[in-house]
Amino acid sequence: MQYEDYILRLFWEASLPVPHPLGIVEITPEREYLLVTEFINGAQEAGEAEIDESVIDQGLAAVRRMWDIGMAHRDIKPANLLVRDGDLFLIDSAFAEVRPSPWRQAVDLANMMLVLALRTDAERVYARARRQFSDEEIAEAFAATRGLTMPTQLRRMLRQQGRDLHGDFLRLLPFRLPPVHIQRWTWRRFGLTVVTVAAAGVAAVVTVGLLGSPL
């Protein structure tokens, strides 16, 4: 809860289009807390709202601003983009990250473009994106984004529409970059895991020995 409040305040202070944070309310001491924010009354999710060029520009500008301040939202999907009277709001910062990897930031861009294209088309979104991002940045975003890097809701809506928006964006690019593989395991991570397990085993043996020895 404290982390989400902190992230939301960083977004707010950086002039990102997020609900105004109003603080934390304690419901049950040391157990339940509630993060209070401005309520975006009358807003619609991006998957249902009318998306015009102004809204597209606002969504892309939000990603550019996060890049500039060294942050990533990490959960850009229709439910987390609200539109009211032509204004876009970015909500739910629980998974946001400070000083993310370039890969994380690239994924934010591709997911934002995919969400905005759900109610428009890849051509319009790509044309607007080129006003704020280079072709190389957009190519990197779509090289990093596919399958598990897309939020579940976004993948489901793409399937329901029967549109290959990811493929549409790739076809618009002047060049493609090799897909960035999600590396779940590396030799370094494997080695650290083995060392940790071995150390835990040694500690357990020593503890059992001490407990079994006479005082």
Residue spans for each PLM region:
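Conserved ATP-binding subdomain of kinase catalytic cores across diverse folds
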Residues: 1-38, 68
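Catalytic activation segment of kinase domains across protein kinase-like and atypical kinase folds
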Residues: 25, 29-36, 72-114
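Structural motif in protein kinase domains
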Residues: 41-47
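Conserved short alpha-helix within the protein kinase catalytic core
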Residues: 49, 53-60, 64
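Protein kinase catalytic-loop region centered on the HRD/HxD motif
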Residues: 64-71
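C-lobe/activation-segment region of protein kinase-like
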Residues: 91-155, 164
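Regulatory N- and C-terminal appendages and interdomain linkers associated
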Residues: 148-215
